[in-house]
């Protein structure tokens, strides 16, 4: 299976409406809100659109991607709150069946209750797609005629205890993810699932920009439709030890390694024990946008 995408052109612009007061670059003040519009586009050549196997015929196509976004940001008692919407339209010039239109909605807030107590929360909704030959159709891209579509949600929150000047910081976290495929075939219904995760992270500063961390999480995966089949529900425990460091004011790196145990509810599936690790970087170029790049043992 082979696929290569060559990006030829990429463009990003910030838009503004003259009738509204431009408070600063990229922001438009509208009452109590700062509106932050943006637009990105790219052109790429894809030489295996459906991830066809080596002995199957392949589809070659140029692809244009257009993605407008609008973020509305404000403050509540000095705490930042924002809501955003992004649309992504992908057009394949030689394969109309693979065209897609995805929608993304997000709301988030960071609240400092006092010098030692902070809370943040985020909610996300995605009406998205999986390219043919990826996700559920991995290795079977030519067996289906259009990309698989799904709806997913994410709700998460963190509570942090510790002053900014203290050496120690305790973070309690919880989140919930759901995934529901649009298709009604049984093969898709049995993959609709909910993932609930709770955890705690203890950090202790060991340098001016370096912190040692102990990260413990428990994840519960539950599938919605399992009538007549063996259950695939599972519980997973992860214990990781590592460090985080601040490379710049806008960039934070992290590296963790440890132990993972995955216990399946089905009696015919044995419990998995093994090592686990996670490495990545978080980049926050502006206050309303954070990018996370990471890789792990999964």
Residues covered by each model-derived region:
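Bacterial N-terminal signal peptides that target proteins for export
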Residues: 1-8
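Bacterial N-terminal signal peptides
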Residues: 10-16
